[in-house]
Amino acid sequence: MRRPVWFFDLDNTLHDASSHIFPYINDAMTSFVARRLHLDRDEASQVRNRYWQQYGATLLGLVKHHAVDPHDFLYETHRFDELSGSHLNDLSNIVSGEKGLRQLLNRLPGRKILLTNAPRAYAQKVLQELGIVGCFEAVEAIEDMEVHQQWRPKPDHLMIRRLLRKYRCAPHRAVLVDDTLGHLREYSKLGLKTVWFKRHVRTYTHNRSNVSLEVQSIHQLFKSWQKLK
């Protein structure tokens, strides 16, 4: 495969988000839902999970059914700077990538774009902490995934088709590196190559028919990417 265009996921791909960041975000989302919909926390957690399962993102359900401002939701659920007195109040305490990450990304041939369902401000902070801001041609965050006045995060087909046109990339030259099999499955249908980053995956599945390559690290990706055909 010559000079691919890489679309890298962020959380649980370029760093471990499951240990500290995701638990905080999930708790913040539950608090937001409880406050806005006047529910207790158990009910709010059920709503959050139901919308996530139904729409692929809690945000989409809140926008569709409750007219929630998406920018308010993203801001309120990613305010790590507000956690004074907590080990989470500084992302530098909890964000770390594998050794030599910047060098590995820079040596990987092809264009590189960050594609994340997280908000832009959060993504930029994480990239800064990892020291890899300069490794990416662009950052495509959830705020950039609006198509026809609707928010369409991964694994939406219209959104990725728009990005392929934007970067003048044929589907067969694009590679999605992601920890979420559902995203890989959907985009493989459009002809993209798919790399399953499974280092931080806690539940495995036997249905991997839509995965072009499986890796445990960016180092392994660097060593084996030419297996993509």
Short names for language-model regions:
Residues 1-3, 106, 119-229:
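Asp-based, Mg2+/Mn2+-dependent phosphohydrolase catalytic module
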Residues 2-8, 13-99, 121:
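N-terminal helical cap/lid subdomain that shapes the substrate entry/recognition surface
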Residues 12, 114-117, 178:
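Conserved residues at beta->alpha junctions
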Residues 16, 114-116, 196:
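Hydrophobic residues in well-ordered beta-strands that form the structural core
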Residues 39, 68, 110, 169, ...:
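Short glycine/serine/threonine/alanine-rich loop segments
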Residues 74-92, 100-130, 136-145:
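Substrate-recognition element of Asp-dependent hydrolases with the DxDx(T/V) motif
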